[in-house]
Swiss-Prot record:
GO molecular function: electron transfer activity; iron ion binding
Protein name: Rubredoxin-1
Statement: the UniProt record of this protein carries the keyword Amino-acid biosynthesis: no
Organism: Pseudomonas aeruginosa (strain ATCC 15692 / DSM 22644 / CIP 104116 / JCM 14847 / LMG 12228 / 1C / PRS 101 / PAO1)
Location of the protein in the cell: Cytoplasm
Amino acid sequence: MKKWQCVVCGLIYDEAKGWPEEGIEAGTRWEDVPEDWLCPDCGVGKLDFEMIEIG
């Protein structure tokens, strides 16, 4: 599972955790997140997220 970070506000989407508040179940891969999904903190789209490594 990977993590993706919003380049605008820094929010991190963790594929292992998903985003249940937004209707995205745990284990949902980034490519399976709907294309029209927006960052819940700043409102940008998926194109403004970059894959990151944490650790």
